[in-house]
């Protein structure tokens, strides 16, 4: 993607990954109501411009809807899976204050994020085998230096059970 347009750094993976708000699984929809004019909504405009892309990147399951120039004062509304709605007033707040506030009320705790990261690292540990969805390797034969699968390359005669049984029977 070319680095053109207004503030193109917002579209880089490094910038998107730096967002620190990861919502709880109960958050399903987020609506942002703001105005494109006026001093009171400056923080909301900056929040939409700089922080919404990070939130979208970190929370792909959350639907985000923007409503411009439809309200006298800017606010955020979150719809939870229980049917509950959380209303956040963002008038006179800066975009950083808005981020801290929504992280505090609807974001996952730091301990939870660390536990999930540790679990993810354990799941993709190179010593684990299983379906590609969960592990790096499906079979032990994919490890270099190991005996290949008998279905792909026939085993040496000395390693087969039939040969060992015949050898025991003959002695």
UniProtKB/Swiss-Prot annotation:
Protein name: Small ribosomal subunit protein mS25
Gene Ontology CC entries for this record: mitochondrial inner membrane; mitochondrial small ribosomal subunit; mitochondrion
SUPFAM superfamilies recorded: Thioredoxin-like
Sorted UniProt keywords: Mitochondrion, Ribonucleoprotein, Ribosomal protein
GO MF, one example: structural constituent of ribosome
UniProt xrefs under InterPro entries: Ribosomal_mL43/mS25/NADH_DH, Ribosomal_mS25/mL61, Thioredoxin-like_sf
Subunit structure of this chain's protein: Component of the mitochondrial ribosome small subunit (28S) which comprises a 12S rRNA and about 30 distinct proteins.
Record-stated family: Belongs to the mitochondrion-specific ribosomal protein mS25 family.
Signal peptide feature range: none
Location of this chain's protein in the cell: Mitochondrion
Gene3D superfamilies the record matches: Glutaredoxin (3.40.30.10)
Keyword Oxidoreductase tagged: no
Organism the protein comes from: Mus musculus
């Amino acid at each position: 993607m070319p680095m053109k347009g207004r503030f193109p750094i917002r579209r880089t993976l490094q910038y998107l990954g730096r967002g620190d708000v990861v919502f709880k699984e109960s958050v399903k929809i987020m609506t942002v109501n703001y105005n494109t004019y006026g001093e009171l909504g400056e923080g909301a405009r900056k929040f939409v411009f700089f922080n919404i892309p990070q939130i979208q990147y970190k929370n792909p399951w959350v639907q985000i809807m923007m409503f411009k120039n439809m309200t006298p004062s800017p606010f955020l509304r979150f719809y939870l899976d229980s049917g509950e709605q959380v209303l956040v007033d963002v008038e006179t707040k800066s975009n950083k204050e808005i981020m801290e506030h929504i992280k505090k009320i609807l974001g996952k705790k730091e301990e939870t994020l660390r536990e999930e990261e540790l679990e993810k690292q354990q799941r993709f540990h190179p010593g684990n085998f299983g379906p590609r969805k969960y592990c790096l390797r499906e079979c032990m034969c994919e490890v270099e230096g190991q005996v290949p699968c008998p279905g792909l390359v026939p085993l040496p005669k000395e390693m087969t059970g039939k040969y060992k049984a015949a050898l025991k029977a003959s002695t």
